[in-house]
């Protein structure tokens, strides 16, 4: 914590988020995870690609072929497979696409 003006939110999970919510529309950095549920694989790709920011996205699947297809189909800088947050290792770049602050 700090005594400087501003806002602080501890580690938080926002579940059942929809694209209409501001938590989805804004680019948030910190210990925050936003979870959207989609009907099918193509909807997941479409949702990621239609967003104005392209920093990172994650998908949970037990199908390696779908994981590879997802990686090559989404327009983001970082993709996580079966991890909550796509955090790069020290030898990978950290960056996004589109209007992402780090893009």
Please describe what each predicted stretch is.
Residues 4, 8-103:
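Conserved C-terminal structural/oligomerization subdomain of aldehyde/semialdehyde dehydrogenase
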